[in-house]
Amino acid sequence: MAEVLNPTSLETSLSELERWETRYAVPDYAFGKEPNYFLASCKAILPRSGRALAVADGEGRNGVWLAEQGLDVVSVDFSPSAQKKARALARERGV
């Protein structure tokens, strides 16, 4: 079933976008460039190849790290500024 948008949810989405854009539009990486501690602690149980979906990946620190581990990663985030930084981090790391 398709979701019906109402003006309230659209306003909420726009304010959320503004909030995340404000967070990620700065030059520095809000959470750094290294992966989340929990994700990194799971390295031993990750497959050596395959696909991964990094949802709400922000500036890409987790998705890029997963790609460095040999996975084919799709990284998604709500913020265009975060997506831009994620692509830059991936280029910097060669993945």
Each predicted region: which residue ranges?
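Conserved class I S-adenosyl-L-methionine
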Residues: 2-47, 49-58
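Residue-level preference for short coil/turn positions at secondary-structure junctions
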Residues: 48-49, 69
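Conserved SAM-binding loop of SAM-dependent methyltransferases across substrates and taxa
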Residues: 59-71
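Conserved SAM-binding motif I beta-strand of class I
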Residues: 72-77
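Conserved SAM/SAH-binding beta-strand->alpha-helix loop
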Residues: 79-81
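Conserved SAM-binding loop
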Residues: 86-87
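S-adenosyl-L-methionine
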Residues: 91-95
